[in-house]
UniProtKB/Swiss-Prot annotation:
Name by which UniProt lists this protein: Methionine import ATP-binding protein MetN
Localization in the cell: Cell inner membrane
Assembly description: The complex is composed of two ATP-binding proteins (MetN), two transmembrane proteins (MetI) and a solute-binding protein (MetQ).
InterPro entries associated with the record: AAA+_ATPase, ABC_transporter-like_ATP-bd, ABC_transporter-like_CS, ACT-like_dom_sf, MetN_ABC, MetN_ABC_transporter-like, NIL_domain, P-loop_NTPase
Keywords: Amino-acid transport, ATP-binding, Cell inner membrane, Cell membrane, Membrane, Nucleotide-binding, Translocase, Transport
Pfam family of the protein (one): NIL
E.C. numbers: 7.4.2.11
Organism: Bartonella henselae (strain ATCC 49882 / DSM 28221 / CCUG 30454 / Houston 1)
Length: 344
């Protein structure tokens, strides 16, 4: 059963007046569930940045409604928006730390701005320093920290006021792969420990695959696909999603792709698999049941949300079309997706 919606977007639009109106968000509806990690992905210009600015009230929508914990916040004044904005944490690609302040004071800054006394600020900042793994760095200055450590400070600062939701705007895009992984693991840990809702705005499928529970794909201001991450990875439907997945999933080697024909001696098949079938010798089972021996041309196995998924490219003898048809049907039943790409 899904958790209740923390934020609901109802047919929102945001257009910018130029010589021709450009709608960065176009009649978009979305529910963000309490406690989930939601990945929002799309190419440059898809509307991701505008969406996050609408979520935190920095952009005002032109049409539709935004509900925060059931309250319509779409038309609130800046003063009325303030208490809701305090429930939203933000982390960015650039860390935006105060170079003249030590780590403890950087983290405590949001509390100082809201009038929390020094003793409480100090206590809360120390708790967050421990949470993000920076014990011993309390009195260091930003210039003394690595990029990953600076982002940990940014995360701690975003949590200072105990937000209900954390918005991450390309927060790992400036980091190296190893540091990116450590930051994503930290966010996943914070999500579990605090039951904190996290929205990841990113153009990187690797980020979504690593920790998101659900993914939304944006294109030209509209949601073109959404669902559980493992479902999107194994059975993408929209061309935008398929194109973005090509960057992070195995592809048919060029020596086969450039020689595909309508007919041939060997059928080239793509199959996506998930769950129990990944633990079985299913190609042996295929040979036993259908009588065709498949060869693996390329592929890979990965783990998404604790479930094993895979994408394989197979070659199957095509001389017996009836047997081939049965084999494709058998593979379709066993896998999430199966397609004959052509013949060689």
């Amino acid at each position: 059963m899904e958790n209740p919606s923390l934020i609901s977007l109802k047919k929102i639009s945001r257009c910018f007046n130029t010589t021709t109106d450009i709608c960065a968000l176009d009649n978009l509806s979305l529910n963000i569930h309490a406690g989930e990690i939601l990945g929002i992905i799309g190419r440059s210009g898809a509307g991701k940045s505008t969406l996050i600015r609408c979520l935190n009230g920095l952009e005002r929508i032109d049409a539709g409604s935004i509900f925060f914990e059931g309250v319509n916040v779409s038309n609130l004044s800046e003063t009325e928006w303030a208490p809701y904005r305090q429930r939203i944490g933000m982390i960015f690609q650039h860390f935006n730390l105060l170079s003249s302040q030590n780590i403890l004071n950087n983290i405590a800054l949001p509390l100082k701005l809201t009038g929390i006394n020094k003793k409480q600020r100090h206590k809360r900042a120390l708790e967050l320093i421990e949470l993000v793994g920076l014990c011993g760095k309390e009195y260091c200055y930003p210039a003394e920290l690595s990029g990953g450590q600076k982002q940990r400070v940014g995360i701690a600062r975003s949590l200072a006021a105990n937000p209900k939701i954390l918005l991450s705007d390309e927060a790992t895009s400036a980091l190296d792969p190893e540091t990116t992984q450590s930051i994503l693991e930290l966010l996943a840990d914070i999500n579990k420990r605090l039951n904190l809702t996290i929205v990841l705005i990113t153009h990187e499928m690797e980020v979504v695959r690593a920790i998101a529970h659900r993914v939304v794909v944006l294109n030209q201001g509209r949601i073109v696909e959404e669902g559980r991450v493992k479902d999107i990875f194994t059975s993408p439907q929209d061309d935008t999603t398929i194109a973005m997945l090509k960057l992070v999933t195995p592809q048919l080697p060029e020596k086969f792709a450039k020689n595909l024909k309508p007919r041939g001696q060997e059928a080239i098949i793509e199959i996506n698999i998930a769950g129990e079938i990944t633990q079985q010798p299913f190609l042996n089972l295929l040979e036993d049941e259908i009588g065709l021996r498949a060869r693996i041309l390329h592929g890979g196995i990965d783990t998404v949300q604790g479930e094993t998924i895979g994408r394989l490219f197979l070659g199957l003898p095509a001389q017996n079309q009836e047997a081939l048809k049965k084999a494709v049907q058998w593979l379709t039943e066993k896998g999430r997706y199966c397609e004959v790409l052509g013949y060689v």
